[in-house]
Each structure stands twice: as C-alpha cells, then as structure tokens.
C-alpha cells in the first residue's frame, strides 16, 4: 500500500528499510520495486542489522536526494492491468505440464498418477549445479534456498529448448501458510517474465490458485497409494542397502519394485495394491544380507525439499552411506498428515472452525486407511519398523514445543527428531535452508533441549544454501559418525562384559 501511495503521488518518495535475515523482506522488496519501477519512480532500499555502518546509508540517501533534484517529475500514464496467464481446460489437452523435482522416489510415482488422469506431466530428473545458478540469476538471492532450486530447475528446463513455451504450463504445490513457500508462485511468475516466458501459466496442485486443475477423489486415492508405496519402498531399500551380501542386489530389487509400483498405480485394484505391498516387503525381508553388527543409524530430518532433494542437500544420503551409515529417512506421507493437522490445532488452540477440523480428521483417516496394509506388512517383517500415527507424533512434539508452531515444518520437525530418538536412532542430521526462520526455531532451537532430555542424542544441524561448502558439511558428518561409532563400540564392550559376567556366574 505504501508503494502504491508513493507511486501515485509524484511529490512522495519511498525508502524501504529491510532487516538482514528477514525472510519476508525478500518478497516485499521485489514487489515494492516492481510497483515503483512500473510507475517510473526511483526505488531505494536500505538493509540494516545490529552492526550496520550508517555511513553507507548516508551515501545512499545523499545520492537519492541528488537524483531527485536533477530528475524531472515522471509523466506517467497508467496502462490497463494485464491479468496473469491461467491454466484452462484447453491447456490440459494441449500443454506439457512441468513440475519441479523434490523427492525422486515419490515424484516418480506422483508423475504416474497425474498422467493416468490425462495430465501430460513431466518431472525433470535431479537438476545439476548450473541450474541453481539460473535460479540465482532470476530470484532474489535473499529468498530461501528451496525457491532458488525449484525455480532455477524449471527455468533451465524451459531454456533448454525441449519445450514449447506457448504450450507449456508449470505446476507447484502451494502451502498457504506462514512459510515463504506460499509465495513461490508469485516469485516464479516474476522470474518467468524476466527470463522471457511471461506467457507460461503457473497453477497450484493444491492451494489457492489451482485454476482449472481439479483434484478428484479417485486421483486423491491414487496419490495416497503412490505416497505409501514410495515410503515403503524407500524404507525397505534403506534398511538392506548397507548390509547387502551381493553388491547391487538392493539397487536391482529397488528398480524392479519401483516398476511394479508404477504398474499397480496405472491399472491396479485395491487388492493388487495390498498384494504389491505385502510381496515387496516380503522380498526385501528375504534378501540375503551380511551377518555383521548393525551400522550406526543416522536419521535425516528438516525442511522437506532439502531433506529429500539430492542436489539441495549435496547428496547427503549417498555421503552417509559411503561413510558406513544406515540412513533413516522419515516418511513423506507424514508431511501431508502434518499439514492436515493445522485445522485441528487451529480449532483446539486458536479460532479455527469445527467443520475444518472434522474435514481434516476425515482426510487423515483416508490416508491412514491406505497406509494400513503397509503398517501390517512392516509389523510382520523381521527387519522393518512400522510407522506411527500422526496423533502419536503430535503427542511426542507437545513434550517440547507448542503445537501452535505451524509455520514451515513447525512442530512436525521436533516430532520427527523425538520419534527417531525414541526408536533408538540417536544420530540425527537436521537440515534447514539458510535463513529459514520457522525451522531454525523448531529445528536448531530445540536441539539443546533435546540433548538435555536425551543425553545420548548426537544431533548435527546443517544449513543448506547455494554457497554452502560441501567440504565443511562432509567434515561435520564425519565428526558425527566418529562419535556414533565410538558409542556403538562402547555399547558393544558393555554388552560383552555383561555376557562374560553372566557366564562366570
């Protein structure tokens, strides 16, 4: 509103003060600049923090005053408002729909679901480092790292020449919360216009700006199946991979079952879905493994993109496996359940509606219905652990933080760490984008508390951004694993002493 007022009044000049590290300022500064420059006005921004030298600010202000003194008042003539391009029913038949990569296993199956219902969706493979440079070129560098990764990848795909911009649309997931991810669509549209693709429609898979896209009940059911299948496949693969007797067995079995999961989604019935889960778990449970002691288990938690996206976290999972760890990845389905809990918490703690709470509970029941076959199969296995309910996750988090922390990953991030510790996984890597304030509170902010509550917890926080040092990250992981191995050795010696004592007695 201030920018509009200054733009419409030639005798008013606007100076915006931006706080260093304030996430929302990365969005508002771009929008204020756009409003003023569209009206041919000068935009001035001063970035301040507790150690700022006001000398630089004085120079900027003097420069502004000198420019205003020499400048003629702009003769601005307002132009008609141009609406953004929309995703229409015609686009469904004609357009290729680009969607960003986030979690490779899960999105391979989500792509199958959308194609089944007539959407020509393409989810590009894991991007390269140069794609992040494209994001840095067109996105405010103070914006959170996931936005730079996602937008950089999509722009790189459009610039590759593989797609006709006039017949291409982009699909994103809109969270509609306090997280900056709610604004990714506006940031992406601005980047598309700057890169020369203003005609490309951007719409939401879920959120406010869905345009002509509709999530039908059959599509929702298939998406739930895809998420559960991918979670189960990921859990089984990660458990057997460090112990495989014949190198490559885990990878071959993973590829085999991923293809079966695709076919199950494309044309399988509910009975086939349940059979696929049972047989997949049984196959991994029977896979030949080396008879060696359990390796250090390391849980990976954090912001959803940097947790699952290989490039965004510098291929963390591969690094941990290469260092001799067993990687424990939280389940993707739990994130959707966490989002559904918002309406429950708003009703219980704030001013939320009862109808929204009931709708969320129904949604949770539907997801749990599709997860029931996986839970049963994992419980019957000898190697794998079954997932706990989202209500149990809420209870675990409420020990340490208020459930009112709903921005970003909120209380769910704390719940993931507590759940891992309660299940015996004491080594945890907590990932967050640099400057992600909500996750710094419920991630980094609770680590000290968790260490006090669980003295054996070995938790390492790692910030991810475009300039993060891979060497520094690797050194921190090696230090964490050294502590983990020492703890494993100490426990083994203690158990051996106990056995020796019992034998002597």
Where are these regions (language model features)?
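An N-terminal assembly and electron-transfer interface module characteristic of large anaerobic redox
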Residues: 1-505
